[in-house]
Amino acid sequence: MFLLYSALITLLSPIIMLGYLRRIRQGKETRALAGERFGTQLETPPSGRDVYWVHAVSVGETVAAKPIIRELRKARPDAWIVLSTTTLTGRDVASKVPGVDQVIQFPIDFPWCTSKALRTIHPKLIILMEAELWPGFIGTAKRMGTPVAVINGRFSDAKLTSWLRFRHLLSPAINGVDLWLMQS
């Protein structure tokens, strides 16, 4: 299923790129951060340090990630903590979160973007805040042997129905998660 998703997302990449360019024109993305979204202009964490990658989509998820990052920093004071966001407003908030060593834009879910980003960051663990599941990213992480945890996730009946409709395409993401810490 990972190959099917990768083929489909690659086939749709011209349309997705047009949407990305539109977001730049609307001010929802910035050209200066395009390299991060494509996984090419990322700082390599220092060697010899465990890397933990926390992904929070926007402001709400970033705020929810603060206690996780605080406890992670207490438990692993020498770790390198990367916090990624998808939105510019989330990035602004993320840049002020104590204990974070690196703030980046989350890579677009194209196979070449996610694999480049994951090879550069090389995390020991990926923590996804809420149920923000990207099949390409999670599938690539699994192929690299990186565990993935979803924290603070919620599934409404509507979301579950939607996911079930696309379960064949989403199975790499769902099956790739090692730990689910969900809200009821």
Question: Which residues does each PLM region occupy?
Answer:
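Membrane-interacting alpha-helical segments
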Residues: 1-19
